[in-house]
């Protein structure tokens, strides 16, 4: 189920403050964040965010196509190593 339109997109408050601070300073740095649940807004386009995936901050460069999605969609949390190989075939 999607979020109600009348509520608007969810953004953590500290994230907006961090973006404003970087915009004022004019620096082009990675903005570290832990809020995977926040929605990407049009004002975030052009910035690079370090989205935490449980181990490290994955750099995510925001472009126009990402607006409306959540930050967590672009930083996978699980690593797939493939299914177990056949041990008999491996031994030969």
Curated annotation (Swiss-Prot):
Pfam families: Ribosomal_S19
MF GO annotations: rRNA binding; structural constituent of ribosome
Ribonucleoprotein among keywords: yes
Source species, domain of life: Bacteria
Keyword Lyase included in the entry's annotation: no
GO cellular component, one term: small ribosomal subunit
InterPro entries xref list: Ribosomal_uS19, Ribosomal_uS19_bac-type, Ribosomal_uS19_CS, Ribosomal_uS19_SF
Keyword vocabulary terms for this entry: Ribonucleoprotein, Ribosomal protein, RNA-binding, rRNA-binding
HAMAP family: Ribosomal_uS19
Protein's job: Protein S19 forms a complex with S13 that binds strongly to the 16S ribosomal RNA.
Family: Belongs to the universal ribosomal protein uS19 family.
Protein name, entry field: Small ribosomal subunit protein uS19
Species of provenance: Mesorhizobium japonicum (strain LMG 29417 / CECT 9101 / MAFF 303099) (Mesorhizobium loti (strain MAFF 303099))
């Amino acid at each position: 189920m999607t979020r109600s339109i009348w509520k608007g997109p969810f953004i953590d408050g500290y994230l907006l403050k961090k973006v404003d601070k970087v915009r004022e300073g004019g620096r082009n740095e990675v903005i570290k964040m832990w809020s995977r649940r926040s929605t990407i807004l049009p004002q975030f386009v052009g910035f690079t965010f370090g989205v935490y995936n449980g181990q490290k901050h994955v750099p995510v460069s925001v472009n126009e196509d990402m607006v409306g999605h959540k930050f967590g969609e672009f930083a996978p949390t699980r690593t797939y190593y493939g299914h177990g190989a056949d041990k008999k075939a491996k031994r030969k």
